[in-house]
């Protein structure tokens, strides 16, 4: 599908009527791409707009480019892969599935993330994350690799604000990191490394 002349409604209508693997080119900020998709694969070139993969329920979305805000909003299952950076509030309230970001994430990534039943959502950020990472996190795994950072912190201000569950892994010595009192911070142990190993391998 050439999305360069389609608004988000027309584009999403075509997606819903095209099962299997679908390649989308010329993406220019169209919203809600893949929202609620249960199966199939979307391969996107360009920049999808807000709420990419919102309510995703099993499909796979891969983006060759950047993505805007709210990637994987309330995601339940499936996988989103972004070969670029993403905007704010990625993984908002996600309760299953996996999001992989090659570059950086904006503010409030992983806000309200939660685990549900046997589902453990995972958000993997290859670069750095903005302020309020893991805000009100209740479950799931956030992993920040900081591969693009050599001198600056890989997480900005106020990480884990209001966090009361889940795990946040940082490839960092933690110097200068200010965490709320309710958050237990420690070096990763063998069990931790085993837990995140599959996500690092997937990345």
Q: Model regions: which residues?
A:
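Long, distal/terminal scaffolding or interaction modules
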Residues: 1-203
